[in-house]
Amino acid sequence: MMLRRILLALVITALFSGAEFAKGGVSARGAQVDLTPGKFEYYALALSWQPAFCEGHREKKECVSQTEERYDAKNLALHGLWPNKRGDRQHKYAYCGVGKKTKNLDKPDSWCRMPKLKLTDETAENLPIYMPGYASCLQNHEWYKHGTCSGLKANDYFAAACTIDSKIADSSFGKFISNNIGNAVSSDSLLDEFEKDYGAGSRKFINLFCDRADGKALLSEVRIYLKKKLPGNGILNGSFALPDKSERGNCPDSFIIDKAGFSEN
């Protein structure tokens, strides 16, 4: 009789645990992650330097079609805008309210089969410019994995991201990158430009990421950390947030701002 009670208790516990697991993910420490939209601490705005990205992804549509004159060959381009929780090192805060069928489609070869997003004509026109990965339906992956946790509608989410990207392109920081295409620059010089725009000490709100090609370090991504309330005008002053301690860039002291076109192997 006692054994039956113990077994019954174990079954009930397993059922309740399964139900709770369905509501959330698991953090790096095994704790439950609440997947309620809007329950996060800050955004990571991931901006890609597309020429360097394309060195390692030459088969992608957006890389095959890239030209030196296109926006993403001369400016940081939108990769993603990720709602983040502190301590969530494995980024389990994702797919908020997304069904299993849609989640199972979240693979590069099936992104274009994910449910179509509701965007205004203006956003639908701008997004392919600022997010070149639109050619591979990256916007679907970014929305269903990350955007659904923002608490925003898809159109507002992408419109805000595009506006911010355009403002960064026009900043001293953005122009420094554009003016040094093909050149080697130092991390400090780039971060100094960021502080010219956003104030002394603002470099603590940004991380630089590099890839290697032909033994050379190439700037591949910039991540800027923002408060939950995004600036409607895209101007970032006063909108920064400190990232989780696990967020660290990997660029060396100096690196190259790659130009469009593939380097010879």
Regions found by a protein language model. Name each.
Residues 1-7:
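Bacterial N-terminal signal peptides that target proteins for export
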Residues 7-8, 70:
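Generic hydrophobic-segment detector
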Residues 9-15:
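Bacterial N-terminal signal peptides
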Residues 15-17, 97:
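Alpha-helix boundary/interfacial micro-motifs
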Residues 23-180:
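Catalytic cores of phosphodiester-bond-cleaving enzymes
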Residues 23-27, 119-265:
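C-terminal, well-folded lobe of enzymatic/effector domains
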